[in-house]
Amino acid sequence: RWVNDMTGLPIEIHTHNDFGMGVATELAAVTAGAVCVHSCANGLEEKTGNAALEELMMGLHLLYGYDTNYRLDKIPELAEMIAAKSNIPIARNKPVLGHGNFIRESGIGINYVMNDPLVMFATHPSLTGKIGEVVLGKKSGKASIIYKMGELGLGELDDEKIAKILDEVKATGITKRDVLSNEEFVNIVSSVQAG
């Protein structure tokens, strides 16, 4: 702010993400009077990258109330195109873009995922054209199994079979160190049903 006050000139900011603070620094600069911020889609650039365009746009819009005139629902489409062209995949845990932003593995709160997503997620999935998703793995509970069976149209089972399915889901999640695909889950359900 003092540079702006001292010079009276418009201030621009260009940050790198060396300490994971590129976006935070640019948001702070905007609140201090910067009128132009530099960023790159998916945060890509040399070294550790620049401030991520998508994180900056969401921060300006949601945290500071700026109307950026951008189609936020197009962010994933742009990100996927950039990832494909650059041959640099989007990390699962990347803010705004990562697949992990709108998934829930643990059984607690799965009703919120679909009915009140802001209880579970930092932003509403629909803002970027996404939906919340329940996935299954080592942290899943009975409610997750029942929910996923309904989602996939697999019918209803008694508590004993649900417990067996849950045990298999947890064991598979631990073994593969990841969440299960729908196909893996359907195979487990079929196996338990066959008895």
Positions of PLM-derived features:
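Alpha-helix-loop-beta-strand connector modules within alpha/beta enzyme cores
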Residues: R1-I13, M58-G59, L63-Y64
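Active-site-adjacent beta->alpha loops and helix N-cap segments on the catalytic face
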Residues: R1-N4, K47-E55
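Hydrophobic faces of well-ordered beta-strands that scaffold small-molecule active sites
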Residues: I11-T15, V37-S39
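Acidic, glycine-rich active-site loops and adjacent beta-strand->loop/helix elements
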Residues: N17-M21, G43-E46, I82
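Catalytic cores of alpha/beta
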Residues: F19-A32
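Glycine-rich phosphate-binding active-site loops on the catalytic face of alpha/beta enzymes
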Residues: A32-G49
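Conserved, mostly hydrophobic/aromatic
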Residues: G33, L56, M149
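A mid-to-C-terminal "edge-of-domain" accessory segment
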Residues: Y64-G195
